[in-house]
Structures are given as structure tokens and as C-alpha cells.
Amino acid sequence: MTHVFPASLQAPRSRLSPNGLELSRIVAGMWRIGEWNMSAQQRLAFIEQCMALGVTSFDHADIYGDYSAEGLFGEALALQPGLRDKMELVSKCGIKLLSPHRPGHAIQHYDTSAAHITSSVEQSLRQLRTDRLDLLLIHRPDPLMDFDEIASAFSELKTAGKVLHFGVSNFSRHQFESLHRRFPLATNQVEFSPLHTQPVFDETFDGLQDLGIAPMAWSPLAGGRLFQGGDANVENLRNVIKDIADELQRPFASVVFAWIMQVPCKPLPLTGTGRIEAVGVAVEGTQFTLSRSDWFAILRAARGHEVA
């Protein structure tokens, strides 16, 4: 049976930090935009449908789609440039892929030098056809990263008005706090789902809650593994979530999104879909909370054992 969403369904707004950047609580991830086989007009229609649901924040990275995803989004945005001031654009940099589009790259590696951060931003702005990014993230921690150099690059980009807010992705608590002491960070985007619960237990989320900073959560549905396949433990987790969803009369994925957003540091989950119905399911997850019993039932099934 098809789930019917109320016409008034809207994603709420959420501040990443006190007096900081405000995003939609659900963020539309653009990683796979090149796989959606949409024309520029169809991409624009999808963007507009997301925004009608209150999903005004769009997550990119320079490398997505083998360096093509930002350009596909920018091409669509150029058809309706007035939308730019009604949305928030997030992008990432710091990874250099082996790619025919980057013939100068001899090996896949990280680069968090000031020069690369700056050139990546310039390229993202051109591709997205905008004059500023609302949020720039360092994509992954780099063994050669110099916190002072990164902070200096951030400061110069902010002064130039090319990037309004800054953060990181996949950083440990210590790495985050080391850079945050040098330049105020808005968020840490990390993997989090019932099949990847480490941020709850490795102090990543504790540290962010202590600072009053909300993380962003990528792969909230575990890359689709929650829906099919997996071992007996995953199958049991799937059944537990399904039972809760049936009892609450909510879509399966809405329960997962609600579970993620119930963590006290207030994560903002990313979608990865080109189907507006699936975005609506994510937004519905903002409309209810789980009982503690149901929340812990999912955690128990995810970990395969009771809490101590």
C-alpha cells in the first residue's frame, strides 16, 4: 500500500550551532545525481520538489560523479537562478581522485593544502554557478593536514565572501576539536545509521553535543543494506524496525530517520535518492519521536546484544 503524505509535510529548520548556519533538518545528498538519468529540466523539477518539502539544503563534493555532479546541479540551477537565495549549498574538498578529468593526478591521495582548498572552492563555485558556498567541509582527515594552514585558508575564503561557514567530514573528536580551536567549525559530517553506530560510542557525538554543534549524517540507510540482504543479524534488525514501523503506521525508512535524529546532538541526515517520494519519507521522520524502548530495541538489534 502506498503511503500518503499530508499536504502540509515540511522539513523543519535546524541550526548547526548557536547563532550558526541554519539548514533544513533533512539534507538532499547529490552524490548520485549523475546516475539519475535526468535532463536539466528534470533535475530542476526535483530540486523544486525538494524545496517544496522544506528540504532546502543540498550536499555536494568536488569529486562526486567523477567531478561531474556539481556541474549537473549547476546546469539545472541556471534554469531558475532565483532559487539560489532560497537554498543552502554544501560542498567538500580535500580528496584527489585518479580520473580522466584530472590527468595531473598520479595517485589517489588527500590534499588539504591551502592552495588546493582554494582552487577546489573556485572550481565548485564555477560548477555550481554561484558566487558563494554556504558550507565547505574538508572531506576526510589527511595525515599531512596542517591545522594552522587549513584555518588560514578558511579565514581567507570567509573574508573573500566565497564561503560563509566551514566544517569537516569523517573527523575524530580530537581532530575536530584541534581544528575548531583554530577556526570555528559548523559541523562534522560522519557516517551514522543503525548499521554504523560508532559515533555514539567513540565520543564523536558526545564531543559535538558538548560544543553545541550538530553533526550531519551520511548513509543513514546504510547504503540500502537495511532493506535487503545481509546476515542473520541484519535480518533481525530489519524485522525489528519493520515491527515498530507497522505499530506506528509509519514508513520503514521514516523510523530509521527518526531514530537517527533522536540522538541529543541533533544529527541532520542526508538522503541519497533522486525519487521525491523517498525524500518525503525522510521528511516524515522529522514528524515523530520513538519511545525509549523502541529506540533501544533498534540499538539492541543493531549491536546484537543488550546494553550492560
Regions found by a protein language model. Give the residues of each.
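Beta/alpha (TIM)-barrel catalytic core signal, keyed to glycine-rich beta->alpha loops juxtaposed to Asp/Glu
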Residues: 3-10, 141-308
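Structural motif corresponding to the early beta-alpha repeats
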Residues: 84-111
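Aromatic/hydrophobic pocket-lining residues that form the small-molecule binding cavity
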Residues: 43, 47, 114-117, 121, ...
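Conserved residues at the C-terminal ends of beta-strands
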Residues: 29, 61-64, 136-139, 169, ...
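Active-site mouth loops of central-metabolism enzymes
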Residues: 30-41, 103-115
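Short, well-ordered coil/turn segments that N-cap beta-strands
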Residues: 21-26, 54-57, 83-87, 130-134, ...
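N-terminal binding-site loop/beta-alpha segment at the start of enzyme catalytic domains
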Residues: 1-88, 307
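CE4/NodB-like, metal-dependent polysaccharide N-deacetylase domain
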Residues: 116-137, 157-160
